Amino acid sequence: MAVPKFKPSKSRSRTRRSINMRKKIPQFQECSNCGNLAIRHRICAKCGYYRNSQYLELGL
């Protein structure tokens, strides 16, 4: 059976696992209808528009 010859260092193990530890930050862009910051590719929470079309009717 194969056995590792040397103990892997902390930096090597942590470098390998670092891809799973990255935080995903949502991307924001300005809404084309109201100018509010909204998450990309999502309906604007303030006005209910996405790509110049109204998808939600919000009572303001």
Curated annotation (Swiss-Prot):
It comes from the Bacteria. Disulfide bonds: none annotated. The keyword Ribosomal protein applies. Keywords: Ribonucleoprotein, Ribosomal protein. GO terms for biological process: translation. One of its GO terms (cellular component) is large ribosomal subunit. One of its GO terms (molecular function) is structural constituent of ribosome. Transmembrane segments: none annotated. The keyword Ribonucleoprotein applies. HAMAP family: Ribosomal_bL32. Belongs to the bacterial ribosomal protein bL32 family. This is Large ribosomal subunit protein bL32. The gene is rpmF.
